Amino acid sequence: MTRHFLALNQYTKEALDALFALTRELKEEQKKGIPHRILEGKSVALIFEKSSTRTRISFEVGVHQLGAHPLFISSATSQMGRGEPVRDTARVMARYCDGVMIRTYGQEIVEEFARYSSVPVINGLTDLFHPCQIMADLFTVIEHKGKYDGLKFAWVGDGNNMANTWIEAAAILGFDLALACPEGYEPDRTVWDWAQKKATSSITITRDPKEAVRDADVVNTDVWASMGQEQEQKVREVAFKGYCLDDDLVALAKPDCMVLHCLPAHRGEEITDSVIEGPRSAVWDEAENRLHVQKAIMASLLK
């Protein structure tokens, strides 16, 4: 049976820990200049229906460093953008390529693609989940803190794909997670209900960012209006007033807390310049670790 990386809920704690271990190994080799062309001679299709900076660059570079050939495909240059059924594209690409990464809108698109693909499919981002990013975030926490268990994670802002994936991660890995979201901007209800049934740790939601951040080891946020929600920007600015990660809010967390943001950041909205540039920020390590985590995911699925 073909294995895919579509959402964290497919994986056990042990499987995710194994990916973190492989990430560390590949990162150390890369820093030492030791080649690891594990996927020599293979080809990986990178399908983008949403524009990207970090996802595209990190996947293209990662595929190259693993010895494979990346094929960038946008909706404007593929038949998917003209209405070809997902199942048809999936079947054909599987005949040409050894793996596929998709960055798109609906989670149902990557799931249908995987259902009809005979090669591994990786979720590069959907409106529901962003599993590669959360894996990079968690690996960054492991690097800085030495662990994730026993820590309190805080999420401040929109209950978006990042928040949904953090909820899944907390339920699977067993760390405490406190979310602060305005009314009407909560995480996906199905994801929330699944996590509440599965979790052995504390996963809570509040309207008060101070309550969520207080005594946190890791504080995380994201933009108030995600891609495709630009027309809601003004309404969201009103709804998210008081949800900015500034120095006063971060001061409520533990003195050695980490601040994360998946980028791009709208400085002065969800996070201030002083916080993202400050000593608690691990944002740039987090961005780099997208490369290493995604290499581990591809290596584990495609080798």
UniProtKB/Swiss-Prot annotation:
Keywords (A to Z) from UniProt: Amino-acid biosynthesis, Arginine biosynthesis, Cytoplasm, Transferase
Which BP terms in the Gene Ontology apply to this protein?
Answer: arginine biosynthetic process via ornithine; citrulline biosynthetic process; L-arginine biosynthetic process
Q: What is its main location?
A: cytoplasm
The record's section on Gene3D superfamilies has: Aspartate/ornithine carbamoyltransferase
Cross-referenced InterPro entries, in alphabetical order?
Asp/Orn_carbamoyltranf_P-bd, Asp/Orn_carbamoylTrfase, Asp/Orn_carbamoylTrfase_sf, Asp_carbamoyltransf_Asp/Orn-bd, Orn/put_carbamltrans, OTCase_ArgI
Its GO CC terms are: cytoplasm
Q: Where does carbamoyl phosphate bind?
A: S52, T53, R54, T55, Q79, R103, H130, P131, C132, Q133, C262, L263, R290
Localisation:
Cytoplasm
Class of this enzyme: transferase
Q: Which SUPFAM superfamilies does its entry note?
A: Aspartate/ornithine carbamoyltransferase
Q: Which domain of life is it from?
A: Bacteria
| Residue sites binding L-ornithine per the record | N161, D222, S226, M227
User: Reaction(s) catalyzed by this protein?
Assistant: carbamoyl phosphate + L-ornithine = L-citrulline + phosphate + H(+)
An annotated Gene Ontology molecular function: amino acid binding
Q: Could you say which EC number(s) this protein's record lists? A: 2.1.3.3
Pathway in which the depicted protein is active: Amino-acid biosynthesis; L-arginine biosynthesis; L-arginine from L-ornithine and carbamoyl phosphate: step 1/3
Similarity annotation: Belongs to the aspartate/ornithine carbamoyltransferase superfamily. OTCase family.
Q: What does this protein do?
A: Reversibly catalyzes the transfer of the carbamoyl group from carbamoyl phosphate (CP) to the N(epsilon) atom of ornithine (ORN) to produce L-citrulline.
What name does the UniProt record give this protein?
Ornithine carbamoyltransferase
Q: Which organism is it from?
A: Geobacter metallireducens (strain ATCC 53774 / DSM 7210 / GS-15)
Q: What is the lineage of its organism?
A: Bacteria, Pseudomonadati, Thermodesulfobacteriota, Desulfuromonadia, Geobacterales
